Amino acid sequence: MSERLKRMMGHKEVSVGAMLLGVMLISWLFNSTFLSFENLMDVIKSNAVLGTCAMGMLLIIITGGIDVSIGSQLALVTVLTGQIMNRTGFDNLILIYLLGIAIGGAVGLLNGLMVSRLGLPPIIATLGMASSIDGFLRYYTNGTWINQLPQRIIDFGLTKFFSLRNANGSEIGVPVQFLLFALAMLVTWFLIKRTMLGRSIMAMGSNPVSAQRIGLNNKRLTAFAYAFSGMMAGFAAITYTSIMKSVDPNAFIGYEMNVIGAVVLGGALLTGGSGSVLGTFLGMMLFAFISNGLTLARISTYWQSIIVGGIILLAVSFDMIKLRREERRQTKVDIDMTAQGKGVA
């Protein structure tokens, strides 16, 4: 194997992409409709919310944190904006999206302040937030759905670009949710790769002590990462409402595991300092295609959860084993260099 090929295979994105192609091939062998344009677009539409939230979660995981309240944030935004639309008939999509982003960003910022200013462990801070939001929603909605949303948001959810009619007379095209997800990816990529803020977050995640020594404000960077994730959740929540045409306050129970799983499958390390937009996208698609393939193969939803959960555990375990090996190798190199230095002296 050439040195260049070895370096390519060492990139997490390449290995995830190879697994994605393998899953697609196996699923196609079981069901020939898997690779049809209609199915691929349905998969993307159904997972646009997951992908958008994963882009926000990526920043948090890069900092070495985690947010298990993401599902509760989604539910909160859908319920509050859904109630406004239901009771007033308000249907200005731009303002609704901005409101959703503001609500999600506020909750995310509160999470970030609890972690950065109060020093609470991320899992404790966000778990407490999730519990508080869930309790409020149960009290506020009594578990009832919100229906009768403005027609404009329903029509928006059905919007397709480059539409054509297939042989059956059905309309096929690129769903608007794909473009919204692409926008979320572009914003996240630009933030990480083209701004000092994004590079500072990467540096802090890799080595918080060194980042602070060179003058980076770790507390502000952490708070921003959680706020950004909340804004992405708010953006995704409105997209979800446009897809479902109604609001179910219980729709996102356990959803945070899907979001975290997609980011981890894409190569981000839970220890921080590692992760990319491309890897997260591939991880989300791998997650989505595995679920879709199992559905088309008529596998029970219970077994689907077991299989997907097992894959996530294997991915995390593999990454941690690889990280431990690299740490041991680096420690050995440091010891050898120290011994050589003493020998020269």
Describe the role of every protein-language-model region.
Residues 226, 230-234, 243-308:
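Transmembrane alpha-helical segments in multi-pass inner-membrane proteins
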Residues 89-130, 282-283:
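Alpha-helical transmembrane segments within multi-pass membrane transporters and channels
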Residues 7, 122-194, 223-224, 244-249, ...:
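Transmembrane helix-bundle core of multi-pass membrane transporters
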Residues 23-88, 113-120, 263, 267-277, ...:
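Single transmembrane alpha-helix segments in multi-pass membrane proteins
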Residues 13, 46, 122, 151, ...:
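Loop-to-transmembrane alpha-helix initiation sites
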Residues 1-25, 206-209, 213, 217-220, ...:
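Cytosolic-side transmembrane-helix boundaries in multi-pass membrane proteins
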Residues 92-100, 107-111, 165-247:
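Helix-loop-helix "hairpin" substructures at the membrane interface of multi-pass membrane proteins
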